[in-house]
Curated annotation (Swiss-Prot):
InterPro entries the UniProt entry points to: NTF2-like_dom_sf, Rng_hydr_dOase-bsu
Role: The beta subunit may be responsible for the substrate specificity of the enzyme.
Protein name (database record): Benzene 1,2-dioxygenase subunit beta
Record-level Gene Ontology MF annotations: benzene 1,2-dioxygenase activity
GO biological process assignments: 3-phenylpropionate catabolic process
Name of one Pfam family that matches: Ring_hydroxyl_B
Length: 187
């Protein structure tokens, strides 16, 4: 398995331009994904995930400059999320149930995705993507959380209505200390 944190090396230089149609297709896919998450249409969102999904959010630590490559935990270290399809399905069941105190009442979220850069891979129809995000979450009366960061995805073209599926997602948040009560939502 590719160390998804170190896939950043793919984006050390400006990617070669891709066809505008492909850029638009992928951006529209992300906008649709954000709408599904914001509208809490989790079953439809889950259908965008590949059966071999790896959903990973490493822990970020503050490091001095010479140790900056150790800023994020690796695949064999602790992580906020290190999920496959089965784990994702369990998380989905939990946050949509009436017994999950962390999402009952449900959070109100707004996902904003931007700065989408695309690199075609050696596999036909698969793409490495870097995008930036902001997730705004409001819950109950006064709980407010804002997360910003980068998502590194591998998308695979498929015949589904959305046109792609998410094979791999790595979420690199800008915060090293998470002040939110929980992480009971999806990025």
């Amino acid at each position: 398995m590719i160390d998804s944190v170190n896939r950043a090396d793919l984006f050390l230089r400006k990617p070669a331009p891709v066809a505008l149609e492909l850029q638009n297709e992928i951006e529209q896919f992300y906008y649709w994904e954000a709408k599904l998450l914001n509208d809490r249409r989790f079953d439809e969102w889950f259908a965008l995930l590949a059966k071999d999904i790896h959903y990973f959010m490493p822990i970020r630590t503050t490091r001095i400059m010479r140790d900056s490559r150790l800023e994020y935990s690796g695949l064999r270290d602790y992580a906020h999320f290190d999920d496959d399809a089965t784990m994702m399905k369990g998380r989905l069941r939990k946050i949509t149930s009436d017994v999950s105190w962390s999402e009952n009442p449900a959070s109100r979220t707004r996902h904003i995705v931007s700065n989408v850069m695309i690199i075609p891979t050696e596999v036909e129809g698969e793409y490495e993507i870097s995008s930036t995000f902001i997730v705004y979450r409001n819950r109950l009366e006064r709980q407010l959380d804002i997360f910003a960061g980068e998502r590194r995805d591998r998308l695979r073209r498929n015949k589904g209505e959305a046109g792609f599926e998410i094979v791999n997602r790595t979420i690199l948040i800008d915060q090293s200390t998470i002040l939110a009560n929980n992480l009971s939502f999806f990025f």
